[in-house]
Structures are given as structure tokens and as C-alpha cells.
């Protein structure tokens, strides 16, 4: 199980009561996605649904929450370069190694874990999403950029 620094645990312990809507020192299982994200994790919607379903109807203490937090922290899914490359290659209709910047923006905002427009802008502004003069992006470079974190 992933370890968390004591300072982060203390910070979470201080913030945990903000989600306690009944004053019993516990949170609803349905709130887990919000709580996880507020404490710096970014689980996928599918992960949140799975966790919430497993804890449906339950009230969770801080210790219960901390165990879930550690579990999610330890299983953060990161795709491989090959996963990103092959996924983006599907949009290279002409086999040039390039995809339309507009199409890439659309894919990032509408498929899988949907990104906000601000998140898409941030990704595209980074080194890997630079569009050429024709508005195309080299998806090999973009996939490598994604792997940098």
C-alpha cells in the first residue's frame, strides 16, 4: 500500500470534517470521489464509480477513508507510450505521423476521461502539443510528452 507523508495525513485530517454533513466524524461513501479529488488524487470516473459502489450506503471514518486514499494512490493508472501512440495513430488517416490539432483537442475533450477546455489548452501549450503551420500535431512527440507526466 502507498505511503503518505505525515504532514499530508494531518492536512487531510484537518479537511475531512468539511465533508461530514451529519456531524458524526464520518462521510458518505457517495462523497468519496469529491474527497479524493480535494486531497490531490485524480481517480478516473470509472475508479470513483467502483469505489462509491463498494461503499454505497456506508458512513466512513477518517481511518476508513485513509485506507481508500492509500489504495487509490497506489494504483494510479498511467498508460504506456505504446497505448497513447496507438490510440492517437487511429486518427492519422493519411499515415503521415500527424493528426489535426483540432481533432486532437476534440478527442481530449470528448473521449475517455474527458478533459476541460482549460486542461486541453494546458496540454496543447506544453512541448508535445505544438501545432505546425498547417495546424497538425506530431502524435509521436505528443505521446512522448504525455509520458513525461
UniProtKB/Swiss-Prot annotation:
InterPro entries on file: CALM/Myosin/TropC-like, EF-hand-dom_pair, EF_hand_dom
KW Repeat (keyword) present: yes
Keyword terms: Motor protein, Myosin, Repeat
GO molecular function: calcium ion binding
An example Gene Ontology CC term for this record: myosin II complex
Presence of keyword tRNA processing: no
Domain EF-hand: 7-42, 79-114
Subunit structure: Myosin is a hexamer of 2 heavy chains and 4 light chains (two regulatory light chains and two essential light chains).
Protein name stated in the entry: Myosin, essential light chain
Amino acid at each position: 500500500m502507498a505511503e503518505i507523508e505525515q504532514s499530508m495525513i494531518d492536512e487531510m485530517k484537518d479537511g475531512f470534517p468539511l465533508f461530514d454533513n451529519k456531524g458524526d466524524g464520518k462521510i458518505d461513501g457517495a462523497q468519496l470521489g469529491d474527497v479524493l479529488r480535494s486531497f490531490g488524487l485524480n481517480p478516473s470516473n470509472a475508479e470513483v464509480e467502483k469505489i462509491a459502489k463498494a461503499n454505497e450506503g456506508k458512513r466512513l471514518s477518517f481511518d476508513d477513508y485513509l485506507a481508500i486514499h492509500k489504495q487509490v494512490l497506489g494504483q494510479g493508472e498511467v498508460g504506456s507510450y505504446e497505448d497513447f501512440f496507438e490510440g492517437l495513430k487511429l486518427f492519422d488517416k493519411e499515415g503521415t505521423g500527424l493528426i489535426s490539432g483540432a481533432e486532437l483537442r476534440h478527442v481530449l475533450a470528448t473521449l475517455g476521461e474527458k478533459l476541460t477546455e482549460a486542461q486541453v489548452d494546458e496540454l496543447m501549450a506544453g512541448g508535445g502539443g505544438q501545432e505546425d503551420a498547417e495546424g497538425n500535431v506530431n502524435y509521436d512527440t505528443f505521446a512522448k510528452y504525455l509520458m513525461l507526466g
